[in-house]
Amino acid sequence: MTFNGRFRATLRGINIRNASMTSLSLTGSHAQKQTVLGSTPGALGTIPTVALNGVNPLPRYRHNLLFGTLSFGDRWDRIQRRLAVLGRASTGNVVVPFSDSADAFRRMWESVDSASDSVLWQTYICKDDFVGQKTVKKLEEAHRRGCKTELLYDCGGNITGRRRLVGDLKKSGANVIEHRPMWEHFFPYFLRGMKWELSPGIRNHRKILIVDNKLGFCGGLNIGDEYCGTSEGGNGRFRDTHCVVMGPAVMHMREVYEDTKAPKPWKWSLARWRQIASATMNLRYLEGMNVKHDYLEPTTTFVRQGGGVYLRRQMERAERSTVRMMERMRWKRQRERLNRCLLTLAKNLREGQGLVFKAATGKGDDVATTDAGSKRNNEVSHGQWKLMKRRIDEYRQRAIKNAEESFFRRLRVVNPSMRLLEDTSPVAEAEAYGQAHAAVTQVLSCNPHSRDWSIPYAFWQVSKFVHQRLWVTTPYYMPHRKLMRALQLAARRGVDVRILAGSNRTTDPWFMWYASNYITGMLMASGVRVYEYKGGQVMHAKTVVADSIWTSIGSYNWDMMSNKNMEICVCHLDHNLALTMEKQFLDDMNVSEEVNYEEYQRRSLWLRFSSWFFYTALRIAEKFTFRTFWDPDLSSEID
């Protein structure tokens, strides 16, 4: 390969590498609190023209064809249509979030004390400590008042059993359910062909409290001292988010509660996915009326024009290359002829000098003298060549540096139509959309027994069509393939995608931080901003807020196991609640640290190995626990 070929290959490598870099960020400056987004003048559709932190965005023509004609309202109307078939939705609800776990437990205990008809509590972990004993005591008192009382806890989260804790509650006549005892499912799983439907890894991760069918509580809080704030007797180890729902959505939460005890037959899930397919087909049929004008004609025109320009440029380049080649060949022949003449002249000159020297001195040692002179000349030529090679390397490095700087300058060209969006400022169109539409509350659930994957499907749709902002709070993150790609695509097209998770000191279990760290670079390479919580608590919140209009609070972790567990999320389409959750996200972000891409690339070899090891170990454990499970969309194989 020639020098020019090596230089072009190196330059292409720089462009490819820098297209996935997010390192030249505005670290530590006020500009880091801002997100650059582009928009077409006079339209609500976002069309990014620069990348966030040096990330190569989608090609302009592709972005315009896919997203350029969608306004804020069109996007969220489309999202709502896709989410409508996933779970029961209703209006006229009030959703109040709790960021302080002490307030959440105080409100739940007060509701149990004032219950007159029924108290149904479902949790993943119920510990035998002060908070657990107090909760069970209040349930026992409610049952003695004549309320229908039930406590359902998962045996995977309480593997040692809770017989001593719930003994008195059982004696009072209340219903206590131990969900999926581990040893009852451990041996059948291995003896019956390791069918994933029998796997002991399927756990009930839902946290639901329903009081008198009028109040519904949902979120990430288990029952224990670690989950309750200090003002109510706990130690406040976990930073979590819970919510209370009042309105028709409580009955929808009751349906999810009953679904845990008696999962729906597979036919109901099939009917649900038939509805999804039918809705998708109807939507595509309606949208197909404008496909010719909105997509086919612009695409055909672009390809025709682009192809013509490309062909013309290639022909011009080939013609110029041919001319240069002919010139090089002509100069090469001339140099060869000149060299032959010079060599012949030098040879004749040396022979003539030798004859003269021999005739004058009578000595015949002219050959040795000539050879010594040739060696000196060769040594001088070799030194000159080393100097020239060093200069070529210097020029090459300088050219590469200039090309790299030019690459980033092209990416950072600010279009006059671009605007800065402060973190504390809501998305501009969200308020108008919220005023024009009634607040909608939707209860989503996951149940592997009925092949119900509504929550990851909903998050995938929101990530795919989100307009300007997507903020996710999760203890750790190992999203499945489809959701991972949706996050990366959203970030590439200019959406402010942020993930706030625990750090190596605020993640429980601790090894999940290492597994998440393995894919952090993939997310940041696409423009996703990752924050690590550095507060005094362990991050356990599970929330999503999108475009200052849509909020999700529930028990779903963005990891591979939540796809196989029973989960619940309350999704609320309302501008006011979204503003509250955005403020909470910013409060958590203020005590967090953003992961810098350059520092991430320089992490130690031990950290690289640990991240790879735990990520691989979790994937192996997943395949071992759910051996026969296969779904390409829910696969954890994202690399």
Curated annotation (Swiss-Prot):
Its EC number is 2.7.8.-. The active site is at H205, K207, D212, H540, K542, D547. The chain crosses the membrane at residues 510-528. GO terms for biological process: cardiolipin biosynthetic process; inner mitochondrial membrane organization; mitochondrial cytochrome c oxidase assembly; mitochondrial respiratory chain complex assembly; mitochondrial respiratory chain complex III assembly; mitochondrion organization; oxidative phosphorylation. It is found in: Mitochondrion inner membrane. Disruption phenotype: Knockdown of the enzyme leads to reduced cellular cardiolipin levels, fragmented mitochondria and inviability. Its main location: mitochondrion. This is Cardiolipin synthetase. The lineage of its organism: Eukaryota, Discoba, Euglenozoa, Kinetoplastea, Metakinetoplastina.
